[in-house]
């Protein structure tokens, strides 16, 4: 079994990396493979609502980051997304790539356990955490929890190492993800068959 970790920070080895690495160590102790993808610091193309992904089965913008994540999703069993907190929300570049991934790759995501992690200096983590969870809860994905909301605190690179409670929350998240994955693996025949999708709006 394998879990994809997405580091949504522009800083490759900053506090978001520290938080996700703590989750990764807990997963590996449970014999779960991990892969971490860093979104980097380059500009990320957002969704333009062209709906070409409905025809192509993938986003019309074929950049390296999108292709790398999409390819990884074909052989992962779970996903954990980490972000720094900007104005009580996730990194905008992370949301740009997630909008495209979740809209064009829903068939690669449904029924895979997922979790989000927010890293902040002081406040805004819960709002960013909730925002990321919206991707999962609209995609038929079980959301894995921990002993507290999944946040770690730190400003300068490395400060997250001082957040003993935050790091414990990350380890608990890793163990809980492993537990969910193992239970799903032994009960794959119980995964529900979705109904045909209905789409309505509020205009009469």
Segments and roles (model prediction):
Residues 25-32, 78, 102-106, 137-141, ...:
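Generic secondary-structure signature for well-ordered alpha-helical cores
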Residues 60-148:
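Helix-loop-strand module that forms the ligand-binding subsite of alpha/beta enzymes
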Residues 142-204:
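Glycine-rich phosphate/pyrophosphate-binding loop and the adjoining helix
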């Amino acid at each position: 079994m394998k879990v994809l970790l997405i580091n949504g920070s522009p800083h490759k080895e900053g506090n978001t990396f520290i938080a996700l690495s703590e989750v990764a160590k807990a997963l590996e102790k449970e014999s779960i493979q991990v892969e971490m993808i860093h979104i980097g610091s380059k500009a990320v193309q957002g969704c333009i609502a062209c709906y070409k992904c409905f025809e192509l089965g993938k986003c019309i913008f074929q950049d390296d980051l999108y292709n790398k994540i999409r390819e990884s999703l074909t052989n992962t069993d779970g996903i954990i997304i980490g972000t720094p907190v900007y104005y009580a929300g996730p990194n905008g570049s992370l949301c740009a790539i997630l909008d495209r991934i979740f809209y064009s790759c829903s068939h690669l995501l449904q029924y895979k356990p997922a979790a989000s992690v927010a890293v902040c200096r002081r406040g805004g983590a819960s709002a960013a955490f909730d925002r990321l969870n919206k991707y999962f809860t609209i995609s038929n994905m079980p959301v894995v929890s921990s002993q507290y909301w999944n946040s770690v605190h730190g400003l300068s690179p490395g400060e997250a190492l001082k957040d003993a409670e935050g790091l414990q929350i990350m380890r608990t998240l890793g163990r809980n993800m492993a537990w969910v994955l193992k239970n799903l693996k032994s009960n794959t025949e119980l995964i529900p068959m979705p109904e045909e999708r209905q789409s309505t709006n509020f205009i009469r």
